[in-house]
């Protein structure tokens, strides 16, 4: 069928087209089926229907299809039905609880990267693996396929070090300290990080305050070899692109299949050529890992997968029931990290966690003896070498190396949340703290967030400030404060949690 082209300048993340229902019926295709579009080149796209947006005799091409055809643009194209990709049958096999071969996983990942699958099909695969976990072999094959799906860094100098946090703890700004500590001791650590999806600030959101974070793989390699380390946004690279596409579908489903989590973490480490990796596994209430037993199982699985991939993986189970440090939100966290680098002043939880994990990497990289890594990490902070290295990293990424914590701006609108009575902080709710910080504008508003005056186990008196909320916009501050007062993110010993009034039948 010959159809006239109508471009639609909307990005949908897939090869998609729109047909009028009359033409779709004539072609014999249903919504979600595929069609082949042919002019001087040929591609396959997923079909959407309309009764009035596109007239009969025309085909609407979304941005991605238009771009793919733009070099050989014609006013009309030939459209005919196409078979479903083989991956749809592979997904059905997974749904039936059958095991996949390496070749089938390679085909599936290729189709995901090349946008040949609809989101509902990817969702079916993720749900199937959530219910029926993959075997060790399948998880290894999935990880290798994800590594091979994009760019890879190949360094001439080794070892290559890396660190990853499972997440779930607000204020986890430790990469801003770990990377310069490790690089200052002569090791290479090309740290690719994420932006916050559900949190109040990912490492990339924080580093972006100090320097650009969007670089391609070649630039990351060059900068790392020159100064020893970088702190960049992984989403700007073509490193393990299949992972980003899977995460995009996982998010609205609120699921994180175990095998996918393992593959996601290790694919990014494999793609940057990591030899030694330290995994931070926060455990406790409000984290992804509820208890030590779950943490140990995850650690064993990560170590096992690393061994299969030729990576040396060490895991640290860390305390995750309260925030790291006393700040949540990009600018506030950067200030706290810079203070530690500049003067070794800061919360014990931030210094201890950063030095412990950096120390593990220093020992794995053989620049510190057994059980001596922590001491070397602390010394690197105290003697200013970590700060000097961090300035080099900021400079090579295009930032101002002379920046200090005093130069970082925070939200101008603030309000304290006070203690309702005398006592001790018994508990802090990580998820509520993040919700409140996001209501205040974090992470998009860099100056928004929370400063904690008290943490778990610390005493206070009625009327003392427990936390200060910062916002760049007054309306966002009001929303955050209202939420914090209605449902406080902390419990003070002796405070009333809720009043339930009596009622009378009428």
Curated annotation (Swiss-Prot):
Cysteine-cysteine disulfides: none
Record's keyword terms, sorted: Glycosyltransferase, Transferase
Gene3D superfamilies: 1.20.970.50, 2.40.40.20, Nucleoside phosphorylase/phosphoribosyltransferase catalytic domain, Pyrimidine nucleoside phosphorylase-like, C-terminal domain
CDD domains associated with the record: MopB_CT
Enzyme class: transferase
An example Gene Ontology CC term for this record: cytosol
Catalytic activity: AMP + phosphate = alpha-D-ribose 1,5-bisphosphate + adenine; CMP + phosphate = cytosine + alpha-D-ribose 1,5-bisphosphate; UMP + phosphate = alpha-D-ribose 1,5-bisphosphate + uracil
Record bears the keyword Transferase: yes
Biological process, per Gene Ontology: AMP catabolic process; pyrimidine deoxyribonucleoside metabolic process; pyrimidine nucleobase metabolic process
MF annotations from Gene Ontology: 1,4-alpha-oligoglucan phosphorylase activity; AMP binding; pentosyltransferase activity
Active site per UniProt: 256
Residues making up the signal peptide according to the UniProt record: none
Chain residues that bind AMP: 168, 194-199, 203, 264, 288
InterPro entries named among the record's database cross-references: AMP_phosphorylase, Asp_de-COase-like_dom_sf, Glycosyl_Trfase_fam3, Glycosyl_Trfase_fam3_N_dom, Glycosyl_Trfase_fam3_N_dom_sf, Nuc_phospho_transferase, PYNP-like_C_sf, PYNP_C
EC number: 2.4.2.57
Function, as annotated: Catalyzes the conversion of AMP and phosphate to adenine and ribose 1,5-bisphosphate (R15P). Exhibits phosphorylase activity toward CMP and UMP in addition to AMP. Functions in an archaeal AMP degradation pathway, together with R15P isomerase and RubisCO.
Stored PANTHER family: THYMIDINE PHOSPHORYLASE
Homology family: Belongs to the thymidine/pyrimidine-nucleoside phosphorylase family. Type 2 subfamily.
Protein name: AMP phosphorylase
């Amino acid at each position: 069928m010959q159809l006239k082209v109508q471009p639609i300048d909307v990005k949908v993340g897939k090869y998609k087209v729109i047909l009028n229902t009359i033409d779709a019926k004539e072609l014999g295709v249903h919504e979600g089926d595929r069609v082949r579009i042919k002019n001087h080149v040929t591609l396959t796209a997923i079909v959407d229907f309309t009764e009035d947006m596109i007239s009969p005799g025309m085909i609407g091409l979304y941005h991605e299809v238009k771009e793919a055809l733009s070099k050989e643009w014609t006013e009309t194209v030939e459209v005919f039905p196409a078979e479903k990709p083989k991956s749809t049958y592979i997904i059905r096999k997974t749904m039936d609880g059958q095991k996949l071969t390496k070749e089938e996983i390679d085909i599936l990942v290729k189709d995901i990267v090349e946008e040949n699958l609809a989101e509902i099909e990817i969702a079916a695969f993720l749900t199937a693996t959530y219910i029926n976990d993959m075997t060790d072999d399948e998880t290894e094959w999935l990880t290798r396929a994800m590594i091979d799906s994009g760019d890879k860094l190949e360094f001439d100098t080794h070892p290559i070090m890396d660190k990853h946090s499972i997440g779930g703890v607000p204020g986890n700004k430790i990469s801003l300290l770990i990377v310069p500590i490790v690089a200052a001791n002569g090791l290479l650590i090309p740290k690719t990080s994420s932006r916050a999806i559900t949190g109040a600030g990912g490492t990339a959101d924080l580093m972006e305050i100090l320097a650009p974070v969007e670089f391609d793989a070649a630039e990351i390699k060059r900068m790392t070899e020159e100064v020893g380390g970088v702190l960049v946004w992984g989403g700007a690279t073509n490193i393990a692109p299949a992972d980003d596409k899977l995460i995009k579908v996982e998010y609205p489903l609120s699921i994180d299949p175990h095998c996918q989590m393992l593959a996601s973490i290790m694919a990014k480490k494999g793609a940057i050529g990591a030899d030694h990796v330290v995994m931070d596994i926060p455990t406790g209430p409000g984290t992804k890992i509820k208890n030590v037993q779950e943490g140990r199982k995850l650690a064993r699985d990560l170590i096992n997968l690393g061994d299969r991939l030729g990576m040396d993986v060490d895991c640290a189970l860390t305390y995750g029931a309260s925030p790291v440090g006393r700040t949540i939100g990009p600018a506030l966290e950067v200030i706290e990290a810079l203070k530690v680098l500049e003067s070794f002043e800061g919360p014990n939880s931030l210094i201890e966690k950063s030095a412990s994990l950096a120390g593990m990497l220093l020992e794995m990289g053989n620049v510190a003896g057994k059980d001596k890594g922590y001491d070397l990490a602390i010394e690197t902070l105290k003697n200013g070498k970590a700060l000097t290295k961090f300035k080099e990293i900021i400079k090579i990424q295009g930032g101002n190396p002379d920046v200090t914590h005093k130069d970082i701006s925070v939200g101008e609108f603030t309000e304290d949340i006070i203690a309702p009575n005398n006592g001790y902080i018994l508990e802090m709710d990580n998820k509520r703290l993040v919700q409140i910080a996001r209501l205040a504008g974090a992470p998009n508003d860099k100056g928004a967030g929370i400063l904690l005056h008290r943490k778990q186990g610390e005493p206070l008196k009625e009327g003392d400030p427990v936390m200060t909320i910062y916002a760049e916009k007054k309306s966002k501050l009001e929303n955050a404060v209202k939420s914090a007062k209605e449902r406080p993110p902390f419990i003070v010993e002796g405070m009333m949690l809720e009043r339930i009034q009596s009622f009378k039948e009428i």
